[in-house]
A protein has these predicted regions:
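Secondary-structure junction/capping motif
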Residues: 91-95, 112-114
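A glycine-rich phosphate-binding loop feature that marks nucleotide/adenosyl-phosphate handling sites
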Residues: 95-102
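Aromatic-residue-lined binding/catalytic grooves and analogous aromatic/hydrophobic interfacial grooves
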Residues: 102-114
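An N-terminal structural lobe/cap that precedes and organizes the functional/catalytic core
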Residues: 1-86, 91
Length: 114
């Protein structure tokens, strides 16, 4: 579970990602965002991933403020676009990411990027 912060711009960071990371980081980001939502009280039956790596520094950072959550979500969706561009297909975690985005305002505390 990592976040490769290659640029402050999440789109540029996705484009700079190597092939291996452009594939792997989509799933890891979706897992982190799902974990953060569950840690902040989401327990609905709408499908997102279960909790994992709850004490990992990247997961803790993502859940600290909505701006952190939003950066990771934007980066993960940019990685999805990059994945489609490079490989001509859609990543299975993309729909999870959109669902995380729909839930964010209700569960993630407001705050600036840290």
């Amino acid at each position: 579970m990592n976040i490769f912060f290659l640029s402050a711009d999440p789109e540029e960071a996705a484009q700079m990602s190597c092939d291996r990371h452009s594939i792997k980081m989509i799933l890891e980001s979706a897992q982190m965002l799902s974990t953060v939502l569950r840690q902040h009280g989401y327990d609905g039956d709408t499908y997102i991933y279960g909790q994992t790596h709850v004490k990992h520094p990247s997961t803790i950072w993502a859940g600290k403020t909505r701006a952190n959550f939003d950066w990771l979500l934007s980066h993960a969706l940019a990685l999805c676009r990059e994945y489609t561009y490079r490989y001509g297909k859609f990543h299975k975690s993309e729909e999870i990411l959109y669902r995380c985005g729909e839930l964010r305002e209700q569960y993630i505390p407001a705050g600036s990027l840290t």
